[in-house]
Amino acid sequence: RDVLGSRGLGDVYKRQLYNTFISELEYINKGKNQEVIDERTLFRVHQAISTGLVSDEESGYLRTRGVRISGTAYIPPKNLNDIRAKLNEILYQQEQYTNPLERAVYLHCNIAKLQPFIDGNKRTSRMVESIALMNADIIPVYSSKDADILNYRKGLIAFYETGDYSFYAGYFLDKQVERIKGIE
C-alpha cells in the first residue's frame, strides 16, 4: 500500500519518504513531543526526502536558481533573498493559525507555492503538513488514487494562481472525513 501517495517516484524515493514520515511520527509520539516547524525542521525534512534526488549541495538548502511548475503559469520567486524572506514570513505567520487543520493547509500550500528547494517541494510540504497534524494528534491522510492525485494537484494549482485555499482545503477535508468514516 502506498501510504504517502508518492506515485511516480522510484522505490528508493518512496522508501525515503516513508522512512522520513515514520521517523517524524516516532519523534512526535515519543513522550508527547511537539515538533517545532521552523527553518531547521524544514531543511532537515527536505534533506531526508531529497537525498539521492538532488545533489548534496542542494539537499536541505534553499535553491539558488529559478524553477518552473508544470501545469501552471505561476512562476515562483527566483532570487534567494526573496525566497528566504518569504519563507521566514510563512514560518512566522503559521502562529496565527491555532486550528491544526488550518495550520497544516496554510503551511502546505504556501511552502509548495514558494518552491524553496530545487526539487521535492510538494513532498516536503506534505511532510510539514503531516507534522502540523501529528503535533495535534491528528493522523495525516494521503491517497494514491488517480482521482485524488488529480484533485490534489488541481487544488494546489488553484492556490498557486489565485491564493485561494478553498480548492485544496476541500480536497484535504474530504480526505480527513473519508478516513474518519472508514474508522467508524
Report residues per predicted region.
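FIC/Doc superfamily catalytic core
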Residues: 1, 5-184
